[in-house]
């Protein structure tokens, strides 16, 4: 403090006190150059602006730093964390959680509320108005205990601190402050409230009892309903399939709880079951988002009305309503239209659907699953393109096509592609006759693939459209087979063999290259005009009249045969000129009367006679001599190279012969060594046998360590001491060494 007194004068202190009384906070730390703690920290204590705060661990104060729960900097920290979490949450979708603060204003006395009296509790606002949330069975709950009513309020989010007569106002304020701090830190009241945990345990017991009741009910009619209800793997909810299995079996399979108005008037009835609590707002938000996603799909309401004529009181007709038709705006290529086999995971069809009657007023039905007479109920086919062509596309309906089944996979098609298909169906119905249909089928069966402009009628189709219309107009084939045929025929678009080839000397021909792209299957993403720069397409003539008769071709366009022959001869001459050497060009320029072959290859006598027959100038004679000299040198060089090549080839053959001899000798050596080893083994066995039979005067065998056998020159065998045998062996080893020296 002594070092600070020389900086802080009396006037400065008075001025600082005056500003602090006014409310202005002065920071004089910038004027101080000492290493002591700043003035603000001395007066007000440490702050997060001047200390290293551990933002990830506020309660850890082992290193001397941290934020106190009652510090003024705590609000700034939570604000920064909240903003940071909002920024991080921008890249993912979050369903907002609704918190409803409900306060009990008036409550009837116990026992006065009946089950039939309308509940005066809370109501949630939905798209259809105010609907009761508690349901008809909450009246009985209200007549039980006060604790049960409070539990219902806690489920709605109206959680207030418990008020008791023993707590003072200061205690209530302190509890409220601590509770809000816990919420800011991420811990809700359900962590500390015992009654809330008890409530969750009771709810779990009720759900378990409901599951047991459902198991007993499923033994009677659950098999019929299981074919029509699909269970979500994440939430466990049951929702109806797009095609009801049997109309008569549905009312029997519905439980008795469907008569309650809570299921019919619930906020999210299409996806809520009878056992779920309507107070779970977070679950209701998730169900609402799933309903919005289902409404974005292409669903035909007319088919649902025809296929399922339910009574007015049927809960399936009231709860599971189909969404209206909406445009399909997803940009998905048709190359991805083929899906994997889904025989077990995607049970969309049932055998009862195949037998449902459909209207047959139209002659050419669009390609939808309802037009097929051999639908595969297990989806064994891997090509599901037949499901992607409903007649009602983007609001353009075909009234004569008959009722259709709802298409859950219609969202996978491009909108522009669907417009083209719908216009194609209209063109078929307006001006397409059976004769044109037969012609079109013949063109499909041709080996040359699909041809463009094959018919000049107003209803003629292009290659890609024709293949799609043929598959969509067949009402006798299955959806999978027709779809696979349509896409298999698309691959034939490209080249046509109907164009005639010209009988040219260079085998030049006109190739029927398709100038426009295919709408479905593009064979190449390059511009056809870029192919003209390729060298091997230099002589290719693009003739796009290959669909016409051969007699209709204009003969004036073909050049006369004489010009063709002249052109071919000129090309041959140019080719020969390119192959000529420099001496040949010089001889032609000097007008030499004979060829270079005669100049080079004729013998000396014949060459002199040839020169004497013609009157040649000195320049011609010198050129002829140079050509002969260079030719002879060239021939000599060729002969030299030939001799060298022959020598190299002879050496190569000799080396190969030596390698073969070496391999043969190595094989013989191996055989000799093997035979020698066998002989040594036989001699050793014989030596042991003979030595084992020898006995001394007393009839005892000789010791192998003291005696050894020695073969004599005459074939006899001698028994000598081991020392003498070793000396003789060493002497025999020294003799070859002395010879080498």
Swiss-Prot record:
Locate the compositionally biased regions of type Basic and acidic residues: 198-216, 567-582
Regions crossing the membrane? 7-24
According to the entry, every stretch annotated as the bZIP domain falls at 623-686
Specify residue ranges for compositional bias: Low complexity: 447-492
Q: In which tissues is it expressed?
A: Isoform 1: Widely expressed including kidney, brown fat, white fat, large intestine, small intestine, stomach, lung, brain and liver. Isoform 1: Expressed in mouse embryonic fibroblasts (MEF). Isoform 2: Widely expressed including kidney, brown fat, white fat, large intestine, small intestine, stomach, lung, brain and liver. Isoform 2: levels in white fat, lung and liver are increased compared to isoform 1 (at protein level). Isoform 2: levels are elevated in brown fat and brain, but are reduced in liver compared to isoform 1 levels. Isoform 2: Expressed in mouse embryonic fibroblasts (MEF).
User: Motif range for Nuclear localization signal?
Assistant: 730-737
* BP terms from Gene Ontology: cellular homeostasis; cellular response to cholesterol; cellular response to cold; cellular response to copper ion; cholesterol homeostasis; cholesterol metabolic process; cysteine transport; erythrocyte differentiation
Give the residue ranges for region: Basic motif.
625-644
Q: Where is the composition biased (Basic residues)?
A: 732-741
* CC annotations in GO: cytosol; endoplasmic reticulum; endoplasmic reticulum membrane; nucleoplasm; nucleus; protein-containing complex
| Sites of Phosphoserine modification | 497, 568
Glycosylated residue positions: 319, 331, 394
Q: Which UniProt keywords apply?
A: Activator, Cholesterol metabolism, Cytoplasm, DNA-binding, Endoplasmic reticulum, Glycoprotein, Lipid metabolism, Lipid-binding, Membrane, Nucleus, Phosphoprotein, Repressor, Signal-anchor, Steroid metabolism, Sterol metabolism, Transcription, Transcription regulation, Transmembrane, Transmembrane helix, Ubl conjugation
Using the UniProt annotation, give all residue ranges assigned to the region (Disordered).
108-148, 198-220, 441-501, 551-582, 722-741
Superkingdom of the source species: Eukaryota
Q: Where is this region: Cholesterol recognition/amino acid consensus (CRAC) region?
A: 191-199
Molecular function in Gene Ontology: cholesterol binding; chromatin binding; DNA-binding transcription activator activity, RNA polymerase II-specific; identical protein binding; promoter-specific chromatin binding; protein domain specific binding; protein-containing complex binding; RNA polymerase II cis-regulatory region sequence-specific DNA binding
> Disrupted gene: resulting phenotype?
Embryonic lethality: embryos progress normally to the late egg cylinder stage at approximately 6.5 days post coitus (dpc), but development is arrested before 7.5 dpc. Mutant embryos fail to form a primitive streak and lack detectable mesoderm. Homozygous embryos suffer from anemia as a result of abnormal fetal liver erythropoiesis. No defect in globin gene expression are detected; abnormal red cell production being the result of a defect in the fetal liver microenvironment specific for erythroid cells.
In the UniProt annotation, what is the result of changing residue 496 to A?
Answer: Does not affect phosphorylation by CK2
As annotated in the record, motif Destruction motif runs over 447-451
Site note Cleavage, residues: 103-104
Which family, according to the similarity comment? Belongs to the bZIP family. CNC subfamily.
The domain section of the record reads: The cholesterol recognition/amino acid consensus (CRAC) region directly binds cholesterol, as well as campesterol and 27-hydroxycholesterol. Has much lower affinity for epicholesterol.
Subunit composition and interactions: Interacts with KEAP1.
Protein name, UniProt field: Endoplasmic reticulum membrane sensor NFE2L1
Q: Which organism is it from?
A: Mus musculus (Mouse)
Taxonomy of the source species: Eukaryota, Metazoa, Chordata, Craniata, Vertebrata
């Amino acid at each position: 403090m002594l070092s600070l007194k020389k900086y802080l004068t009396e006037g400065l202190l008075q001025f600082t006190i005056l500003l602090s009384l006014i409310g202005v906070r002065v920071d004089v730390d910038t004027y101080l150059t000492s290493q002591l703690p700043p003035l603000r920290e001395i007066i007000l204590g440490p702050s997060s602006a001047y200390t290293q705060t551990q933002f990830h661990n506020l309660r850890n104060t082992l290193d001397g730093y941290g934020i106190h729960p009652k510090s003024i900097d705590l609000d700034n920290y939570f604000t920064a964390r909240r903003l940071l979490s909002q920024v991080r949450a921008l890249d993912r979708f979050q369903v907002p959680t609704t918190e409803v603060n409900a306060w009990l204003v008036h409550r009837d006395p116990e026992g006065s509320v009946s089950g039939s009296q309308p509940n005066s509790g809370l109501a949630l606002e939905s798209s259809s108005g105010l609907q009761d949330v508690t349901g008809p069975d909450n009246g009985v709950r209200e007549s039980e205990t006060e604790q049960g009513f409070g539990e219902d309020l806690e489920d709605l989010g109206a959680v207030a601190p418990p008020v008791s007569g023993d707590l003072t106002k200061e205690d209530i304020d302190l509890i409220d402050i601590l509770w809000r701090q816990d919420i800011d830190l991420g811990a809700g009241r359900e962590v500390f409230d015992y009654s809330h945990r008890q409530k969750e345990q009771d709810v779990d017991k009720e759900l378990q009892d409901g599951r047991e009741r459902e198991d007993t009910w499923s033994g009677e009619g659950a098999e019929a309903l299981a074919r029509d209800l699909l269970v979500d793997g994440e939430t466990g909810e049951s929702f109806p399939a797009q095609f009801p299995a049997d109309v008569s079996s549905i009312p029997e399979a519905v439980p008795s709880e469907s008569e309650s108005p809570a299921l019919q008037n619930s906020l999210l009835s299409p996806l809520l079951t009878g056992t779920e609590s309507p107070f779970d707002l977070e679950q209701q938000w998730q169900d609402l988002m799933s309903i919005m996603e289902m409404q974005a799909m292409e669903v035909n309401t007319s088919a649902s009305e025809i296929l399922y004529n339910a009574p007015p009181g049927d809960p399936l007709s009231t709860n599971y309503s189909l969404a209206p038709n909406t445009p399909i705006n997803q940009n998905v290529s048709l190359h991805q239209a083929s899906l994997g086999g889904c025989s077990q995971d995607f049970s969309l069809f049932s055998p009862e659907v195949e037998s449902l009657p459909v209207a047959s007023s139209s002659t050419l039905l669009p390609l939808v699953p309802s037009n097929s007479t051999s639908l595969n109920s297990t989806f064994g086919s891997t090509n599901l393109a037949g499901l992607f062509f409903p007649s009602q596309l983007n609001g353009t309906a075909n009234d004569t096509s008959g009722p259709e089944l709802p298409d859950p996979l219609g969202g996978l098609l491009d909108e522009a592609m669907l417009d083209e298909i719908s216009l194609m169906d209209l063109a078929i119905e307006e001006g397409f006759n059976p004769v044109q249909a037969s012609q079109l089928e013949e063109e499909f069966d041709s080996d040359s693939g699909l041809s463009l402009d094959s018919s000049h009628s107003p209803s003629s189709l292009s290659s890609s459209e024709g293949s799609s219309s043929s598959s969509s107009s067949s009402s006798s084939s299955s959806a999978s087979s027709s779809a696979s045929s349509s896409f298999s025929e698309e691959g034939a678009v490209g080249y046509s063999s109907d164009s005639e080839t010209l009988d040219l000397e260079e085998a030049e021909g006109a190739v029927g290259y398709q100038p426009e792209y295919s709408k479905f299957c593009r064979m190449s993403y390059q511009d056809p005009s870029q192919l003209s720069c390729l060298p091997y397409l230099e002589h290719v003539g693009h003739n796009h009249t290959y669909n016409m008769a051969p007699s209709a071709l204009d003969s004036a366009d073909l050049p006369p045969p004489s010009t063709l022959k002249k052109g071919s001869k000129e090309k041959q001459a140019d080719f020969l000129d390119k192959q000529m050497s420099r001496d040949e060009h010089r001889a032609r320029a000097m007008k030499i009367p004979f060829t270079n072959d005669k100049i080079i290859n004729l013998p000396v006598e014949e060459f002199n006679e040839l020169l004497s027959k013609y009157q040649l100038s000195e320049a011609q004679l010198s050129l002829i001599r140079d050509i002969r000299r260079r030719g002879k040198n060239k021939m000599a060089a060729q002969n030299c190279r030939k001799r060298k090549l022959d020598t190299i080839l002879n050496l190569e053959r000799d080396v190969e012969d030596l390698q073969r001899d070496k391999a043969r000798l190595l094989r013989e050596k191996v055989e000799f060594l093997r035979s020698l080893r066998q002989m040594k083994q036989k001699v050793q066995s014989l030596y042991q046998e003979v030595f084992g039979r020898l006995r001394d005067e007393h009839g005892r065998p000789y010791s192998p360590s003291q005696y050894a056998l020695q073969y004599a020159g005459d074939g006899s065998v001698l028994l000598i001491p081991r020392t003498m045998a070793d000396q003789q062996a060493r002497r025999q080893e020294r003799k070859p060494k002395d010879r080498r020296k």
